[in-house]
UniProtKB/Swiss-Prot annotation:
InterPro entries: Aa-tRNA-synt_II, aa-tRNA-synth_II, aa-tRNA-synth_II/BPL/LPL, Asp-tRNA-ligase_1, Asp-tRNA-ligase_1_N, Asp/Asn-tRNA-synth_IIb, AspRS_core, GAD-like_sf. Residues 575-591 have a biased composition (Basic and acidic residues). Gene3D superfamilies: Bira Bifunctional Protein, Domain 2, GAD-like domain, Nucleic acid-binding proteins. One of its GO terms (cellular component) is cytoplasm. Keywords: Aminoacyl-tRNA synthetase, ATP-binding, Cytoplasm, Ligase, Nucleotide-binding, Protein biosynthesis. This is Aspartate--tRNA(Asp/Asn) ligase. The lineage of its organism: Bacteria, Bacillati, Actinomycetota, Actinomycetes, Kineosporiales. It catalyses: tRNA(Asx) + L-aspartate + ATP = L-aspartyl-tRNA(Asx) + AMP + diphosphate. The keyword Thylakoid does not apply. It comes from Kineococcus radiotolerans (strain ATCC BAA-149 / DSM 14245 / SRS30216).
Amino acid sequence: MLRTHEAGSLRADHAGQTVTLTGWVARRRDHGGVAFLDLRDASGVVQVVARDEILDAGGARELRNEYCIRITGDVRLRPEGNDNANIPTGAVEVDTTALEVLSEAAPLPFQIDDHLNVGEEARLKHRYLDLRRTGPANALKLRSAANRAARAVLEEHAFTEIETPTLTRSTPEGARDFLVPARLAPGSWYALPQSPQLFKQLLMVAGMERYYQLARCYRDEDFRADRQPEFTQLDIEMSFVEQDDVIALGEQIVAALWKLIGHDVPLPLPRMTYEEAMRRYGSDKPDLRFGLELVECAGFFADTTFRVFQAPYVGAVVMPGGASQPRKTLDAWQEWAKQRGARGLAYVLVGQDGELSGPVAKNLSDTERAGLAAHVGANPGDCIFFAAGAVNPSRALLGAARAEIARRTGAIDESAWSFLWVVDAPMFKSAAEDDDVSIGEGSWNAVHHAFTAPKPEVVDTFDTDPGSALSNAYDIVCNGNEIGGGSIRIHRRDVQERVFAVMGISEADAREKFGFLLDAFSFGAPPHGGIAFGWDRVVALLAGVDSIREVIAFPKSGGGYDPLTAAPAPITAQQRKEAGVDAKPETKKAAAGEPAGA
């Protein structure tokens, strides 16, 4: 090794020892022929004292920030009154006897300073410098600790870590695939997996019983805030289990993870049905750190003459103190709603005298005006926001308003942790209302994915009434973030084929895209289920950062662009030709036992 000690490891009991350290100059201060250097390595910072003659001997007179150096010297206690209680090494300094410059540093694009705000574009372009800062470096160390903690839980339960392919065939799972040309098969393409879903189910058929991996996944999605085209999930699958078994394991993992930051998660976690979450909170991932529940108002307005409220659904959410908002702010709420696809956000203001005002109030009957505040639980000085129309989009709008109200009013306890399971989600949703890529031609898409088992009580009827069928699925939510989700899987070929049929996937398409899975189900597939945690989001929550980019070593910026390497980038004409990008696939000759064209 080029060093005897790590810089951040030195303490008062090292005084009198001769050490050799390596690292980067974080700061230089000159005082009367002596340079005081803050030497930083991955373990921390220590003060190094170097006289001018030492710098001259090492050819380091021009030493400046971020030079990479090696020093040898004697550890000594700092002079009385010069201790630095803000750093672990603050009781000592190293009196340098030799200094060697290992690598010089060019002028920096930004200062390596934990207290300096640097634009994200510059940080990502020079990520190798950004990671020298304490915050970004600690985020990656926390991620590594989370990996170890999860592995420890799974190893304790005799799970086997297995890697699944990252070059496979395109089997759409709700988003677009990233495609890779196969040079040795011109005109044919691999796909990068959106998840290891099918392979982990095949591992259950193979008898592995307990599988996990920290899996890299890829989804070619349109730009969404805080999404990455490549991401990591902790992927888990188990044979011969029921929903409660998977949930219990998931809770053990969550408890181990949050223990890393000193928080004890009380187990078992509460559960809530999907229907209850949407009805009370307007979200399938409700943040329960605050109240502000939605109030159903369709019955209250059953006899209304106000046409807007003559709708299948009318709901409300109360903003405490919201009546004091100026007209400009109330108008801005309308723009906020329109950005979410709504026509607006109706409101009623409750005056300090209890009188109602606002554009909606004048359209209400005396009876409605008299009873509205009590019905929704509003007090004088509050604002009542309404949504009316189709049930699902109206609830979703109020759910978003609820979260926005909490942010604006400071109702969220930022130090709190709130976990819950959301269970019994619908199996299917209308394809017309779905933003994801449809994998079939039918009018129904899977809410989770096409391999989620129905609740046992609807196994025989889900395809005759898809809209009311519930899935044997479970999502875990933390502070309004879905951090993981899973389900009991389909393990019967006939059930899987019926699900494909509901989604409009023909027998021929099912055979072409998923034939290997259907075939596997013909050979004694065990009942199985699993869960996957969104690892980037989990670590971001643990680290207390707003963006998952902060916990990824080399993240992409908006639109999947990498400022560091300038990827994606064009390829040369020669590369295009060699890869067979424009080639047409040749029809394969059927091998023995293989169908033609397979």
